[in-house]
Regions:
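Compositionally biased, proline/threonine/alanine/serine-rich low-complexity intrinsically disordered stretches
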Residues: 37-49, 315-331
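Acidic/histidine-rich, surface-exposed loop or edge segments in extracytoplasmic proteins
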Residues: 45-46, 111-116
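Short glycine- and acidic-rich boundary segments immediately preceding or forming the N-terminal edge
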Residues: 27-29, 36-91
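Short beta-strand-to-loop junctions in surface cap/lid or active-site-entrance loops
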Residues: 90-108
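Active-site-adjacent mobile loop/cap segments within catalytic or ligand-binding domains
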Residues: 237-241, 249-250, 262-323
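Sec-dependent N-terminal signal peptides
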Residues: 15-34
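Active-site/substrate-binding loop(s) of hydrolase catalytic cores
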Residues: 109, 113, 122-258
Length: 331
């Protein structure tokens, strides 16, 4: 089978275009096989006796993350909660600028939002976010200051289910629940016709119907990230939506733009809002890459940011993207 030769063949057998701007408004649809469900016997997570302690909740489910690394991440409750009432944790890190402008004022920090475990059964996505928190903390300076915001586990209910689940506690695929154009029409049709009502891809009863997707939507509206990094597994590719020239690789992951779905984060952020969205698909949902690969992906991301997003002191930053930005051509 082709899927055995290339995991990406399972992800995007073909892209169907509807022509002109209608394709952008409705989303570029993909016919996809059901997402692989990682099969593994996992330890039962710690009881929720200390709801403000992220490590007490998540540590037993984090591949390649020990107690020391988890504690060092210093995750704190954001104030928002999942559908089942679990805290949504985050961590902000500020990397200072190495230089100032000629006028003696530092450029405004670049805002970067890193999100893991949108799908609760993609455990390595949360672990990678925690590893990257450690790397961000060690950074001395960058050419422009960077305000990092990490949300390692957006879907804690799926992440901590007895068997980790792609969907949240109400059975909703959070990555199909964002308010993209014509969602009410296109998301149900896509789910019924393209996925054959795959329960792992149910978009929900309405856009932003879930507390977790509402929280992320609020972050994108108030934090106004100039880059969103969305971490997934296990297709082993790099995807990109939105303005700017995309990175060609992060570590071993090579760019292969797979299109957007009704209600997806890439569609909402990259196409509709004009925020660059880098989507990382790790090779495995349960096994972390080697440390050298984790560092290589991070270094490649920083190099791309330096080349495409950061601004030299003598070069004024471009105007912010309009909220209704659309790319000039359809993918």
């Amino acid at each position: 089978m082709k899927c055995l030769k290339s995991k990406l063949n399972c992800l995007k057998p073909h892209v169907k275009f509807f022509g002109g701007w209608g394709a952008i408004a409705a989303g570029l649809w993909l016919t996809v096989a059901p997402a692989p469900a990682p099969a593994s016997t996992l330890p039962t997570p710690a009881a929720q006796t200390a709801p403000a302690n992220a490590c007490a909740l998540f540590l037993s489910r984090l591949p390649g993350v020990g107690p020391q690394r988890c504690a060092a991440a210093q995750l704190v409750p954001s104030g928002a909660r999942s559908q089942q009432g679990r805290p949504l944790f985050w961590r902000d890190i500020h990397t200072p600028a190495s230089v100032q402008t000629t006028a003696g004022h530092a450029l405004a920090p670049l805002r970067v939002l890193v999100v893991g475990a949108i799908h609760g059964d993609e455990l390595t996505s949360a672990s990678l976010a925690l590893h990257w928190i450690g790397l961000a903390e060690k950074m001395q300076t960058m050419g422009q200051a960077v305000h990092w915001r990490f949300i390692p586990v957006l879907n804690p209910d799926g992440f901590l289910a007895k068997k980790p689940s792609r969907v949240n506690a109400r059975g909703v695929d959070l990555n199909r629940n964002f308010n993209t154009p014509q969602w009410q029409r296109d998301a149900p049709i896509y789910w019924e016709k393209r996925t054959r009502k795959d329960p792992r891809r149910w978009p929900g009863p309405a856009p932003l119907s879930e507390s977790e997707s509402q929280f992320l939507h609020t972050q994108m509206d108030t934090f106004e990230p100039q880059l969103v990094v969305s971490i997934h597994a296990p297709y082993g590719v790099l995807d990109f939506d939105g303005p700017h020239e995309p990175p060609q690789r992060l570590g071993r992951l090579r760019l292969d733009r797979v299109g957007v779905f009704p209600g997806s984060l890439g569609h909402y952020g990259g196409v509709q809002q004009g925020m660059p969205v880098v989507t990382i698909e790790l090779d495995h949902a349960l096994k972390m890459p080697r440390d050298a690969e984790v560092r290589s992906m991070w270094s490649d991301l920083l190099r791309w940011m330096d080349a495409r997003l950061l601004h030299s002191p003598d070069t004024p930053a471009p105007l912010p993207q309009a909220k209704n930005h659309r790319p000039s051509t359809a993918k």
